[in-house]
C-alpha cells in the first residue's frame, strides 16, 4: 500500500514541508486494485497499533487493523466497499495497552454534535462559479482596497425553526442572506467565527477538535463550499477565524492523541494554557508544524477562502503568557519569546505571501510585539494586517465618558495616529467587546436614549474616517441593546424601532460612501493619507482631519492637475507611464472620486453655530454626509482666505450637538501672500490649555518612536 504514502511523502512530512499533506492523511474515497472504497491514513507515532473502527464494522478494533508505514509513525489502510457519509474513528492501542478512540485529525467532515465521530466525504468534485472573483483578487492591491469587515457568528446571526439542527441556519441560506445583507449595507468581507468543528457551542469555535472539518452544525463541507461560492459571486470576501494557539482536552480530540503528548509539548509549562485549560501545540515538532501550515493552505485551496484571522497570537509569542514566575520556561537566550512559534509564523506567512493570489492573513495580537506586518525577509512575522487593540481600548474608553468630561480625555482619540503606521492595522469593534458584562455598543454610550444613538453615530463616523481597515461585529450596526450570546439570534426585530432603524440607515449610507470615495481607504498605510486639521480642540471636544487618495494631486494655477507635493514625477517617467502605474501625475484618470475628504466630529451636545475649520486652498467643499445621514441635496460651502488651525484657508459650518460633517474638495496650489482674517479664538483659558497640550504632544512625538512601547 506504499503507493498511497510514498517515500517522498514521508520525507516531506517528516521535515514539515508537505504542504498538501491533507491529500494523503485522513479519509479518501478511491479505487484500489479494482475495488472502490476509502483509504485512511493517520499519524500516531507512540501507538502500538491502530485500527479503523466504524459503523460498518461495529466499532470493532480487530476488524480493520491499519498497517504501520515503516518508522514514520503513520498508519494506513484501505476499506473496500466503504463510501461517503459513513461514521468512523481510529482505535489506538497505547503503550499502556489501552484502547482509546479518536476522531480523525485530518477528517474533512464531523458528526453533528454531541456525536464525535468523523464522517467520510469526497471533496474533489465540487463545481466552483467564482472564477471571476478569484482572478480579480489576484490583481487587487489589498492595502489600497476598501475593507469593511462584518464579523459574524453563524450560529447566532440568524436562527431557523429546524429542531433537527437546533435551529442552525444552513450554509446555503447563510450565504444567500449574508450576500444580500452585506451588499445592502456596504460591507466588503465577512469574517466567520466558529467554522472549524468544535464540540462546545459556548467556546464560540475557539476550542477546535476538527481543524479540517467545517462544522456540521450548518451542513456538509460541500454546503460550505457553496456558501463561499455564493458570497464570491456577490462580490463579498470570506475570512475565517483560525485557532493554531491551543486545542481542547476532549477525549476524542488531539490531546494525548496516541496515549502520549503528540500534538502538544510534553512539559505542561510549554504544553498547557493555565487560563483556558487547553493544550498548546508543539511548534518545534515538524509534523505538528506541517499539520497547521497545511491546514491553513487547505482552507485557501479547497474552500477558496480569502483570508484567515489568527486568534490569540500573543499567547503563542510569549512563553510567560498567562503564567506566574516559576510556571514557564525561558528560551535558550533566557527570554520570554517563543522562538519556535516565531519561526512557525515566519514559515507559514512566507508561504502565504508567495502565493501572490490575494490570499491574506490577519493577526489578532494584543501587545506591542514589533513588526507583525513586516515581511519575514525584513525581519517581521509576515502577517498582512493586525487588529488594532490599542485603538479599540482608547476609543471605547473615550466613548463611555460623559461628554462633560471628554475634554480631559481628548488625546485618547488622537493617540492612535501617533503609531498608526507602525503596522498595517485593522480597527476593530469585535465580539469580544460586547460580552461578559462589557455591554453592547449602544449600552456603552452615555446619556438618554436619543443621546446614546447620537454618540454612537459620531463614534462610528470617527472610526470610518480614521486610517486603517475596519471591522464591526454583527448587531452593532443597528444598536442591539443586549450583549451577544451564541445561544440565540441577534435582535433583528429592533429594525422596526425608530432609533435603531435610523442608526442602521446611517451606517448603510456611511459604508457605501466609504466604498465610493477612495480617499477613505486607498492611503490607509501612507503618511499622506491622513492629516489632522485640529487634533487639539479639547475644550470643545471637536475633531477634524483630512483623508487623501494615494499620490493625491493639487490643481495648479493654470488649472491643470499637478502631482502633489510628495508625488512629483520622476525625471525619467513619462506622463503616460505615470497614468498606467496610477502614480497621480498630470492628466491622470483613475477609478473613483479624486477628491480629498474633510471630517468634522463634535463629541458633545453643545451646538457650534459658526465653527471654522482650517482647509487647504480650494474653491469650495461639497457636503456629503451629516449626523442625519447622506446629504439629500447638493450643498457647497465656500473655502475662503483666513488663517485657521495653522492653515491659510478655512470654511465655516454650523455644527450641531453631536454633529458630524463630511466634505469632499479638490486641493489647489496655494498663493504665497499673507492672510488677513484670523480664525476665531477660544476664550483665554481654553487657548492656554490648548497651547499646553500642543507642546506636550509635540514633545511626545519627538521621543516616542512607538508610543505603545514607550
Residue positions per predicted region:
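C-terminal beta-strand-rich structural cap/linker in extracellular carbohydrate-active enzymes
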Residues: 84-86, 638-673
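Conserved, mostly hydrophobic/aromatic
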Residues: 42, 90, 152, 192, ...
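The feature marks proteins involved in alpha-glucan
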Residues: 1-35, 67-151, 156-163, 173, ...
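Conserved alpha/beta catalytic core and glycan-binding cleft of carbohydrate-active enzymes
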Residues: 304-306, 324-486, 494, 515-521, ...
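Intrinsically disordered, low-complexity terminal tails and inter-domain linkers enriched
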Residues: 551-593, 671-707
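Substrate-binding/active-site clefts of carbohydrate-active enzymes
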Residues: 131-144, 153-337
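Carbohydrate-binding surface patches
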Residues: 36-48, 534-560, 565, 570, ...
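Solvent-exposed beta-strand/loop surfaces of large extracellular or lumenal domains
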Residues: 56-74, 626-646
